[in-house]
């Protein structure tokens, strides 16, 4: 990073230092009150939709009660990482640094992120789903977010299951990934899902024209973190 800034370093040492790490979803500690979370590190707070696009806009974590509870009674608050650092880096013509520090990411992969609060405003869960709106080249690697999170929490101690293909699901070339993993550590139950496959009806070659079809595949990841001992739904995800 020092080489990227060159002569600008003497004028902006704080910028170089701050670009080393942005507060992200996985920095948030379960059991923390909403009022004590680093709200300044995030923007665009809204009610979550179980990992989908944001719904009603809200002012911050402490507005969790404005979001309807899920079946578990928890309130999902979606948000994005603050993008001020990205724009500051761009202003200094550091496109590489801006790319690294830009967007909302989990372990360097673009993601939709949210936090789950109980009625008392205590953080009880974290959720991340790979962002399918990104360009095709980046989306190809989205499934790797699950492995990156597993590495972050330690490569050992994971229980993983490779699920069989569902109806109409096929490999991409020779690759078929449909894996769920779980680990309990430091009072947390961490659940990851990785998918790399073609769904029913998706193809690489248009059978009528013989032309290449782009984007017809699933490459995705999902992360759910709850307190150890959390109940699971029918799909094995923590509730």
Protein language model annotation of sequence segments:
Residues 1-10:
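Bacterial N-terminal signal peptides
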Residues 10-18:
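Sec/Tat signal peptide C-region and signal peptidase I cleavage site
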Residues 17-65, 90-112, 119-239:
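Non-cytosolic coordination micro-motifs
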């Amino acid at each position: 990073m020092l080489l990227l800034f060159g002569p600008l370093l003497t004028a902006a040492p704080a910028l170089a230092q701050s670009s080393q790490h942005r507060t992200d979803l996985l920095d948030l500690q379960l059991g923390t009150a909403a009022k004590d979370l680093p709200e300044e590190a995030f923007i665009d707070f809204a009610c979550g939709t179980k990992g989908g696009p944001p719904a009603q806009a809200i002012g911050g974590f402490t507005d969790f009660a404005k979001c309807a509870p899920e079946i578990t009674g928890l309130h999902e608050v979606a948000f994005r990482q603050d993008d001020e650092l990205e724009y500051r880096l761009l202003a200094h013509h550091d496109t590489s640094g801006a790319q690294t520090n830009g967007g909302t990411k989990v372990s360097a992969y673009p993601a939709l992120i949210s936090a789950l609060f109980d009625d008392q405003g205590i953080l009880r869960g974290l959720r991340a789903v790979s962002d399918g709106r990104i360009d095709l080249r980046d989306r190809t690697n989205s499934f790797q977010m699950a492995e990156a999170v597993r590495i972050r929490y330690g490569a050992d101690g994971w229980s993983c299951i490779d699920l069989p293909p569902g109806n109409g699901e096929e490999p991409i070339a020779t690759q078929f990934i449909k894996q769920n993993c779980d680990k309990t550590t430091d009072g947390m139950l961490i659940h990851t899902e990785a998918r790399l496959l073609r769904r029913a009806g998706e193809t690489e070659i248009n059978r009528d024209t013989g032309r290449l079809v782009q984007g017809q595949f699933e490459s995705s990841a999902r992360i759910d973190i709850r307190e150890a001992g959390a109940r699971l739904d029918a799909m094995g995800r923590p509730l």
